[in-house]
UniProtKB/Swiss-Prot annotation:
This is Cytochrome b. Its cofactor is heme b. CDD domains: cytochrome_b_C (cd00290), Cytochrome_b_N (cd00284). One of its GO terms (molecular function) is ubiquinol-cytochrome-c reductase activity. Heme b b566 binds at H97, H196. Belongs to the cytochrome b family. The keyword Transmembrane helix applies. InterPro entries: Cyt_b/b6_C (IPR005798), Cyt_b/b6_C_sf (IPR036150), Cyt_b/b6_N (IPR005797), Cytb/b6-like_sf (IPR027387), Cytochrome_b (IPR030689), Cytochrome_b_C_euk/bac (IPR048260), Cytochrome_b_N_euk/bac (IPR048259), Di-haem_cyt_TM (IPR016174). It is found in: Mitochondrion inner membrane. Binds 2 heme b groups non-covalently. It comes from Ochotona erythrotis (Chinese red pika). The cytochrome bc1 complex contains 11 subunits: 3 respiratory subunits (MT-CYB, CYC1 and UQCRFS1), 2 core proteins (UQCRC1 and UQCRC2) and 6 low-molecular weight proteins (UQCRH/QCR6, UQCRB/QCR7, UQCRQ/QCR8, UQCR10/QCR9, UQCR11/QCR10 and a cleavage product of UQCRFS1). This cytochrome bc1 complex then forms a dimer. The keyword Transmembrane helix applies. Keywords: Electron transport, Heme, Iron, Membrane, Metal-binding, Mitochondrion, Mitochondrion inner membrane, Respiratory chain, Transmembrane, Transmembrane helix, Transport, Ubiquinone.
């Protein structure tokens, strides 16, 4: 008799995705981040659901409702901090996942890569709107500054901003709609994840060598299920350490002050995971130019498949490209640092140089380096 997991219509899908899936025998721990992102999304949806049961999206009571969750709801504090720090873990995994894709040339699976870029944009939008909900000072002013950027769009900009606000400033209508979108987007993300996996399973996974591995596959279960479980344990340990010992390490103290439209905080800055993009935005003196650079800092990932000039897929055997890759990583860390600094000398010029280097590396230096490597290998 055939096993039910191979015949049942629903279990068959699970079986082909998680159990009998042929996987390369040599994928390293860098391939763990996909499943870790799935875990993060699950944690965020569950904790978010419980928070939504007690949260009120009204300007008068939003801040108080978050305080009420932390003080009066059973284990409300741990749910709130798991959700807030879970977002940080989510972005750490996202950045490592994308970095892995760049290093090992996974972007040559263009459909999977493009859905991944959509997922990145959707996650960033969700995180931004979630940051507005506690209605602290940084929530309010962050929402004001970022939504205001759309006014840089010629002709329709001002109308567009007022349409998003639902009025002439960030107010009750804005908070209510942000809550609605923040609630629905994770489910859209979950649907996109399914599409992401659908396209990935059409081609099979890449591997560190970048060489086709069809002749050497192993079943996903038990080999990679056990490997993913180790990743889960490490991620949960790190998250719980953050939540239980340093819950406010990655937050902003300004957000413990209720939103006040009459008092602007001295340094308006987003959560740490947006600082690199914020630094790129601030490095251009022109408003529209800054907004374009901000969008392009992520959208530039979409041109990577077209800029792949190397005859090899992975960077595993390309030391020159590896060097440029790690310079890019260092550059992004520099941008993250600059994004959190005030707009004054020397931070302005460092930010401008780092922003210029970011685009230069991706658009020119890395493709040129690949061509040089081809020449050196006489390919």
């Amino acid at each position: 008799m055939t096993n039910i997991r191979k015949t049942h219509p629903l279990m068959k899908i699970v079986n082909h995705s998680l159990i009998d899936l042929p996987a390369p025998s040599n994928i390293s721990a860098w391939w763990n981040f996909g499943s870790l992102l799935g875990l993060c999304l699950g944690i965020q949806i569950i904790t978010g659901l419980f928070l939504a049961m007690h949260y009120t999206s009204d300007t008068l009571t939003a801040f108080s409702s978050v305080t009420h969750i932390c003080r009066d709801v059973n284990y409300g504090w741990i749910i709130r901090y798991m959700h807030a720090n879970g977002a940080s873990m989510f972005f750490i995994c996202l950045f490592l996942h994308v970095g892995r894709g760049i290093y090992y040339g996974s972007y040559t699976y263009s459909e999977t890569w493009n859905i991944g870029i959509l997922l990145l944009f959707a996650t960033m939008a969700t995180a931004f709107m979630g940051y507005v909900l506690p209605w602290g000072q940084m929530s309010f002013w962050g929402a004001t500054v970022i939504t205001n950027l759309l006014s840089a769009i010629p002709y329709i900009g001002t109308d567009l901003v007022q349409w998003i606000w639902g009025g002439f400033s960030v107010d009750k209508a804005t908070l209510t709609r942000f809550f609605a979108f923040h609630f629905i987007l994770p489910f859209i993300i979950a649907a996109l994840v399914m599409v992401h996996l659908l396209f990935l399973h059409e081609t099979g996974s890449n591997n560190p060598t970048g060489i086709i591995s069809d002749s050497d596959k192993i079943p996903f279960h038990p080999y990679y299920t056990i490997k993913d479980t180790l990743g889960f344990l490490l991620l949960i340990s790190l998250l719980l350490t953050l939540v239980l010992f340093y819950p406010d390490l990655l937050g902003d103290p300004d957000n413990y002050t209720p939103a006040n439209p009459l008092n602007t905080p001295p340094h308006i800055k987003p959560e740490w995971y947006f600082l690199f993009a914020y630094a790129i935005l601030r490095s251009i003196p022109n408003k529209l130019g800054g907004v374009l650079a901000l969008v392009l800092s992520i959208a530039i990932l979409a041109v990577m498949p077209f800029l792949h000039t190397s005859k090899q897929r992975s960077m595993m055997f390309r030391p020159m490209s590896q060097t440029l890759f790690w310079i890019l990583v260092a550059d992004l860390l520099t941008l993250t640092w600059i994004g959190g600094q005030p707009v004054e000398h020397p931070f302005i010029i460092i930010g401008q140089l780092a922003s210029f280097l970011y685009f230069l590396l991706i658009l020119a230096l890395m493709p040129m380096c690949s061509l040089i490597e081809n020449k050196l290998l006489k390919w």
